[in-house]
């Protein structure tokens, strides 16, 4: 569902459309990370329909090309009208002929005209080797058997056997499912199109003068059974390419959107006339040679923005300079202005190094000509970061232990011993030791580990002490691990959980405290941690995210279980406690909506008063109802009796089972804070019409939400937080009330988007409630055989660098959904690779740079993951400044009126003018924190200062060769005022409001 674009986004969309109208077919939107390029694209999608020739075939086709399926899953909903999702199983290029017709048929049936298809290079364009997915081959089978030649039973069987390949399980089911898809009654047009296309392409030459059809007929004959497997391998590759070409013939995109396209820049550098059947060539020939197709490129970093001297010397290549000019050539290709761009840019580039020796006014004119030339084909809006990001460079010297040194020494000694047993291993980077605790336990796909394992088996084991390199599973089992031998990890654990004298006890939190609580409570785990934020950690090393996810989750468990369960062990099976003696599920109280009880609590009417007052008011109303009921009173509370009472109150009956003497208090807490009640009220804000649907979906989501109280860490957290009651379900109610669950869910629903259908909101909430993930971890006991234990990841998880399989993408999507929710995980660790375009900002304002990036733009890209629309720090500061307002929309509306002034509508959604009197004297302002845990006396401190210095100047050298040398040359020659004039202003909003 589309978000309404803000003023600066509308200006960019308008600029793109004007360029299209003026004959420019390729336009780049290079807005800084996090400023909503997808929202700009959605506005272009909406308006480009009006351009001449777009709707000639009654279907408006958009092809969305992005770098991975996680981004596709995130953004396709914004681009489409129907809240579409990406089906990984059908994402291959060779399947798009079917996907297009299926979607087209459904659209026309529903009188719609906009079709959005998603292609991702990691899945859609992999055809140069391999036989593809089972779904891909099943569709090939379903299509080929439409032809008369393959309707013979024996030949169909042979074709099926050839296409089955390694799909030993479930092949028949997948095959028959696609046969059913293709044979659906409303797909007549598709069958006609695909049969005609196949007859044409099957006559193409395969090899040795034979056609694809000849080879197919040969291999599906009874005589070729023995050769079918080997020869069939190469034929399937040919068939995949054939159907990919058919897909490209079928697709007639009016608009191609290439998102984060720097990740597959080969698409814009490929030779369009090349006869090579690579995926890039096929797509490029189709999309880029079609003069009728509009192409919109989206990327915050469309080319490498900066090349350091080290990179220049190491690679012998000025990558930034080449990237920049390659991009310009692509954007201006076939344009009449193309010959002029080199001259304009050369004039500017020649003058810039001589800044101090030439007339500044003349340089400004050349700069303006270059800027106008760029603006013709692109737009770039940048955020104002002043006052948003707070730099935190903690002193971690007190976190250093003897174990840090021993880790390094043990690794070097182990390597020496392995070398004595014939392994070609000499040293390990010092940064391995500084970055990862128990590094050998978490290394995967490291050549170093492979060599060490070989040496270990050969005899190095007998000579080596490795207690700092490998986890001991016995220590893990007994929750005895407390020395991690890594200063960075010790710092993060202390930052999250506190030290011995001042523990935070955040391990007891099951969700982030709401930014805008509806009522006051006494001191609790939530009030003490009201400014707690999730953490996003970026590292250069693949082992670090796994290490952090496993060990920080372990540490949270260790702290919980040591206090909650005497003698607990890691492998203990914690009972499901939400059950009473009669084995009736106590959770039914929490996932059943009582419309009567839900109506008794009106958050807006009681906003700002205490929980005790609200509870007392509701209790009085309930007591009046209970006094009229005929039932035995009892001092024993039972979830069964409470459930019967809820039903009686809803049905208006005067009889029920037993009534607990304190039932009114219990029912008041259910009214205020049970998951079902809170979800019901949250959903009623979205849909006030269909109360049955609202109730059904609220109960559906509540069933998932109750799960957080019904696992190892949830049970321990509730037990430690709520100690005054004996029955677990009463403790859960108290926990929900203390945690302002209603305010928490309302804030979450606001972030999901109240303009979305209720079914999508319900789905998104359920996606955010994930279970613990297992992580295989090497141990001292199992290192020889690579026998690993499984550690749970829940408080912290790792993300990214997964294969683009259906299972891996589903897992990554659920992790991202969970992190962008108030619920666990509270820390997400990743490498920088592949995370461009993804957002993690809903509940995170703390970014830890575990290792410094080599390039200033990478620093910005990382922080762009949390410096985004309505990020956590913005919401919390808005809630503090406009606390008299109740609803989030009301607060943001008021903030817009008071704070926007001459700013673009980045205020108040991206940043707040903290010099405004509303914020100036406050001491509780929250910032995005850039946390850099640097070892004392480390060269990283100097590297960081250099990065920050370059960060403020590198834009001045855009598109120039040898940038770092140019910066040195300009140092001291450019005043701040001159620098402002020489920075390129490519922002449509800024240029229009000058």
PLM region spans:
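Helicase-associated low-complexity regulatory tails and linkers flanking the ATPase motor
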Residues: 1-24, 39-828, 832-994
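Hydrophobic anchor at the beta1->P-loop junction of P-loop NTPases
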Residues: 29
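ATP-binding Walker
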Residues: 35
């Amino acid at each position: 569902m589309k978000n309404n674009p803000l003023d600066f986004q509308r200006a960019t969309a308008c600029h793109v459309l004007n360029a299209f109208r003026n004959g420019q077919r390729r336009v780049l939107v290079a807005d800084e990370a996090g400023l909503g390029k997808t929202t700009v694209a959605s506005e272009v999608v909406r308006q480009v329909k009006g351009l001449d020739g777009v709707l000639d075939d009654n279907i408006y086709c958009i092809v969305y090309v992005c770098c991975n399926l996680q981004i596709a899953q995130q953004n396709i909903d914004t681009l489409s009208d129907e809240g579409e999702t990406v089906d990984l199983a059908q994402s291959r290029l060779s399947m798009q002929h079917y996907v297009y017709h299926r979607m087209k048929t459904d659209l026309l049936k529903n009188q719609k005209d906009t079709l959005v298809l998603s292609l991702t290079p990691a899945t859609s364009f992999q055809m140069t080797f391999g036989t593809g997915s089972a779904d891909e081959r099943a569709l090939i089978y379903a299509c080929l058997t439409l032809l008369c030649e393959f309707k013979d039973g024996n030949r169909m069987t042979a074709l099926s056997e050839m296409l089955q390949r390694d799909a030993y399980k479930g092949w028949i089911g997948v095959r028959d499912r696609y046969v059913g898809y293709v044979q659906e009654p409303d797909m007549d047009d598709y069958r006609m199109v695909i049969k005609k296309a196949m007859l044409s392409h099957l006559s193409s030459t395969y090899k040795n003068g034979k056609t694809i059809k000849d080879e197919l007929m040969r291999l599906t004959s009874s005589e070729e059974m023995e050769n079918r497997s080997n020869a069939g391998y190469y034929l399937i590759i040919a068939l995949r390419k054939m159907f990919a070409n058919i897909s490209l013939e079928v697709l007639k995109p009016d608009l191609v959107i290439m998102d984060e396209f720097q990740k597959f820049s080969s698409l814009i550098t490929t030779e369009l006339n090349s006869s090579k059947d690579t995926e890039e060539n096929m797509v490029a020939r189709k999309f880029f040679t079609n003069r009728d197709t509009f192409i919109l490129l989206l990327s915050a970093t469309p080319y490498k923005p900066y090349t350091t001297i080290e990179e220049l010397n190491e690679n012998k290549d000025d990558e930034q300079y080449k990237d920049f000019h390659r991009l310009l050539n692509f954007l201006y290709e076939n344009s009449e202005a193309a010959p002029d761009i080199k001259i304009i840019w050369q004039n500017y580039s020649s003058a810039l190094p001589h800044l101090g020796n030439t007339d500044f006014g003349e340089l400004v004119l050349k700069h303006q000509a270059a800027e106008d030339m760029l603006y013709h084909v692109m737009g770039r809006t940048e955020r104002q970061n002043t006052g948003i990001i707070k730099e935190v460079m903690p002193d971690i010297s007190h976190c250093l232990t003897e174990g840090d040194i021993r880790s390094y020494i043990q690794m070097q000694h182990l390597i020496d011993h392995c070398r004595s047993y014939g392994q070609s291993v000499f040293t390990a980077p010092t940064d391995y030791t500084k970055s990862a605790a128990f590094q050998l336990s978490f290394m995967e796909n490291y050549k170093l580990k492979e060599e060490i394992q070989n040496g270990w088996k050969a005899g190095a084991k007998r000579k080596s002490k490795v207690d700092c390199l490998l986890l001991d599973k016995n220590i893990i089992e007994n929750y005895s691990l407390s020395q991690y031998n890594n200063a960075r990890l010790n710092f993060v654990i202390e930052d999250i959980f506190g030290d011995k004298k001042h523990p935070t006890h955040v391990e007891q939190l099951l969700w982030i405290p709401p930014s805008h609580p509806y009522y006051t409570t006494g001191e609790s785990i939530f009030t003490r941690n009201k400014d707690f934020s999730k953490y996003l950690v970026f590292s250069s090393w693949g082992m670090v995210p796994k290490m952090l996810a496993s060990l920080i989750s372990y540490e949270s468990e260790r702290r919980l279980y040591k206090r909650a369960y005497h003698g607990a062990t890691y492998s203990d099976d914690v009972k499901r406690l939400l059950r009473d003696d009669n084995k009736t599920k106590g959770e039914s109280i929490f996932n059943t909506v009582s419309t009567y009880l839900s109506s008794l609590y009106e958050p807006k009417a009681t906003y700002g008063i205490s929980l005790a007052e609200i509870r007392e008011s509701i209790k009085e109303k309930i007591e009046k109802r209970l006094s009229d009921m005929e039932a035995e009173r009892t001092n024993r509370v039972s979830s069964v009796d409470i459930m019967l009472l809820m039903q009686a109150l809803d049905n208006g009956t005067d009889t029920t089972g037993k009534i607990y003497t304190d039932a009114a208090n219990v029912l008041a807490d259910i009214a205020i804070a049970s998951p079902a009640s809170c979800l019901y009220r949250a959903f009623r804000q979205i849909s006030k019409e269909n109360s049955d649907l609202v109730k059904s979906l609220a109960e559906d989501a509540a069933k998932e939400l109750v799960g957080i109280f019904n696992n190892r860490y949830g049970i321990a957290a509730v037990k430690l937080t709520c100690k005054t009651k004996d029955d677990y379900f009463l403790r859960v109610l108290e926990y929900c009330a203390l945690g302002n669950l209603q305010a928490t869910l309302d804030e979450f629903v606001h972030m999901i988007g109240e303009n979305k259908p209720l079914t999508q909101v319900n789905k998104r909430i359920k996606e955010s409630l994930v279970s613990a993930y297992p992580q295989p971890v090497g141990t001292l006991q199992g290192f020889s055989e690579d026998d690993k234990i499984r550690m749970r990841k829940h408080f912290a998880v790792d993300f990214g660098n997964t294969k683009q399989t259906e299972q891996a993408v589903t897992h990554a999507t659920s992790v991202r959904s969970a992190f962008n929710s108030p619920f666990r995980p509270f820390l997400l660790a990743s490498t920088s690779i592949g995370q461009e375009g993804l957002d993690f900002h809903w509940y995170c304002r703390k970014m830890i740079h575990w290792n410094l990036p080599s390039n200033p733009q990478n620093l910005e890209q990382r922080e762009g993951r949390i410096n985004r629309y309505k990020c956590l720090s913005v919401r919390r500061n808005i809630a503090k400044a406009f606390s008299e307002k109740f609803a989030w929309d009301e607060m943001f509306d008021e903030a817009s009126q008071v704070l926007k002034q001459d700013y673009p509508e980045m205020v108040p959604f991206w940043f707040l003018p903290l010099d405004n009197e509303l914020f100036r004297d406050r001491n509780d302002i929250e910032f995005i924190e850039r946390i850099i845990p640097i070892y004392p006396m480390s060269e990283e401190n100097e590297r960081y200062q250099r990065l920050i210095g370059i960060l403020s100047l590198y834009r001045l050298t855009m598109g120039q060769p040898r940038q770092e040398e140019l910066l040195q040359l300009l140092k001291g020659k450019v005043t701040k005022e001159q620098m402002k004039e020489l920075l390129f202003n490519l922002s449509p909003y800024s240029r229009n409001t000058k």
